Each structure stands twice: as structure tokens, then as C-alpha cells.
Amino acid sequence: MAAALAAAVCAAQTPAPRILSQPTSAKMSTLKGTLHPFAQPSLDAGRMPSDTRLAGISIFFSRTSAQQAALAQLLDDQQNPSSPLYHRWLTPRQFAARFGMAQSDIDKVQLWLQQQGFSIDSVSHGRNLIRFSGTAGQVEQAFQTQMHYYNIDGRKIFAPSTALSVPAAFASTVANVGNLSSFRPRAQYVPYRPANPRAAFTSSQTGSVFFAPGDIKVAYDMNSVISAGNDGTGQTNVIAGQSAVSLTDVSNFQTAAGSTPKSPITVLVPGSGSSATYAGDQGESDLDLEWSSTMAPGATVYFIYTGGSPNYNVFDSIDFAIDNRLGNVISISYGACEAGNSPSTLTQFESIYPQAAAQGQTMVTASGDQGSTACFQSPTTTSPPLATQEALTVNYPASSAYVTAVGGTEAPSADIINSVTGTGANASTYWETPGASDEITSLLKY
């Protein structure tokens, strides 16, 4: 009965058309917040050749205020044991039927894109995203911008040099035009490197602390949980990445940890290019796959990753998992400081992640090690301005209300956990976060 009610509610909420006239380039509107904060003239390294091919560009659509209110109510009902909608999760197509764009609106935008010379790659099941491909020249003409390269910390990055414009006929429906830059979120793990100089300890303690799966199972009392039959059987865990991995590394780790080797199911995001390996990213994903498989040995693990196209990254892996409803849990070990993303990009992500919640997908991410100084880097001549780096800001998506940030394996004392500089408390620009004075206990003694 509850399932029938959920289906009936969705059917009764078919989205109404929002684009009332055919879009035309004769009347354009600027999209505020679409200029990347690091695309600055002082870092400019020249214009991108007009024939450069860009695949998988995306237009993400916003919801109406009525849709947003209805979605918020649905998320509350799905978590309310007394509601008939309790834990009645939606499929992506059910989500589209209630919270996506009308098909007629999608058709109008696709027609305009094709008139600009773009080829349509796909439309999301949630009917909130169109992917298309074309050249840099077509992008410049269609969105009234220029594509430039920028030198950022020794890397050559590309991005639009101005805010983007779209036809006024559908500008109010657009949350973001994405995948036009090669800024990539960074892995949150820190490889072990001996400090130099090192303290001369007067005891047998080395000062270096390392954890194996057995240690973590003791620290978080996982052995009793697994012994009770809660080993992940029947659950699916998605690891999101942006590099290919070595499955041999994963198998060797499982064997060394005393677990039966079990390879993850690997999925290369369609359209993201050929499978490619990136050193820092491979290490992060190796780590995630190794630990998730040993801590929940009964779970099915998917590894969803992007290929060699530079304008794809781990956030596209997350989008794919959500739009295809892969995984009860989506695990992300990447982040970027809030100030290092354009406002429209954050708006896009904050529109996607509630869909995961409505579909019963739990999202977890690494909290990161930078606390309230997530933007800080080692200053170089091609670093973002120092004022930007030193601003109080935290990592995203750890700061999102729809994502659970996980950390704590360094086992610090409570005064560090509740410290402003240690956690980034109240340093988010966009979302409400716990204050440093809030009593939060996350350290389990053992």
C-alpha cells in the first residue's frame, strides 16, 4: 500500500513546462557565479585553440521553489517512521517525474544546443542534466565567453575567462553549465613521508602511528559488529574515483589483512575518455578499495571512475552513481575548498545530492586534514592570491548537509576535535555547521 501511495504521489506531480518560448541566441542572459575563482588574469597562460574538442559538457537544471519544498518534505517523510513514505526510496525515473524538467523543456534546450553545432551525448534519468560535446570555438560563441589556459601551482588548467551566458528563455532554469574546466578536486589522503628533521625520542616510541584493518576493527569495535552478522552482506558500496587502479594492489592488501581476495566491479564513466592512471589519484582509490573491502567483507564494492578527459573528475563519478542509483553507500575521498569552486558549481552539487537521499543512497566523504584552512597551499608564483588561501573555509563536499564527513583515525584528544583550527567549525560560507563549543564526542578509547 505504501509503495502504491509513493507511486501515486509521484504520478500526480508531473513537472509543468517552464520554458515557454524557443530559446534563441538573439536574447542572452548572464549566469551569475559561473566564473571560476582561480581563473584570474594574473594566472592567464593564453587562449585555447578554437578547434580543441571538449566532451561531456553539461547543463544542470535547477528545481522550482515548489519542487524544492516538495522534495524537502519528501526527505523528511522518508526518515519519519510514522510516515507511510518511510524508507520508500525513489528510482531515478520516479525522481524525474516529480522533480525533473518537463520533457518539452529538455527538447527545447537540446534543439538550441544542436543549432550551435553541439552533439547531444545524453540526458540524465533524473531529467536534470544534459551532456553534449563540441569545440572550444563553439563553446565561446554559444556561451559568449573565451576559453583560456591558466598556470596554477605548476599545472596548466583551462576554464572560461568570463561568466557564461545562455538564452534568456531558459536562463532561470539553469543551475550551472559544467565540465568546461580542468580544475580537479584533490585526494584527501596524505602519503607517509618521514619529517626532516625528526624529534629525538628518549623512549622506544617512534612517534609514527600506522593502522591496519585489525587495529581499526578494535578501535571502532567492529569485530563484535561483524561477528553479529553485520559484515556488509546485501549492501553495495560505491567508491568514486578519477583514476584507474591496480586490482593487484587491492588483492594483495586483502590477503595481508587476512581477508579473502574479492575484486571490485569497475565502471568507467561513459564519455569520460579512455581509462588512465594518475599517480596521486590512484593511491587514493587503492586505499579506499582496500579498506572498504576489508572492513565490510560481505559487501559488493563498485569502483566508478572517470577516464582521461581533463574536464571530467570524481564529481562526475558521483553523478553517474546517483543517476543510475548504484550503491547504498557512495564513498568519496576527495574535496576542494569551498572558495575554490564557483558558486554555480556548488549550487549544482547541492541540487544533485538530495536526489541521492531521496533514492536511499548514503553519501560519506573524507573530512580532510586542513580544518578551517582548506584553501591554503604552499605559496608559489602561480598560486591563488594569499588572501584567498588564508580565508577561513572548509572542504566541500564535507561541508554539505547531504554528506557525512568521516575522519578521526589520528585519534586526537577532545580539545583538538572541538578546536576551530582543527576542524573548521563554523567556517563554511554556504551551509550551517556545528560550532566549536558544541559537545561532540567522536573518539573511542581502546
Language model: regions and residue ranges:
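Boundary at the C-terminal end of the N-terminal hydrophobic targeting segment
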Residues: 10-12
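Substrate-binding/charge-relay-adjacent region of secreted/lumenal peptidase catalytic domains
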Residues: 14-126, 131, 136-408, 441
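Extracellular S/T/G-rich loop segment that most often corresponds to the catalytic His/Ser-adjacent loop
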Residues: 392-446
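Bacterial N-terminal signal peptides
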Residues: 1-8
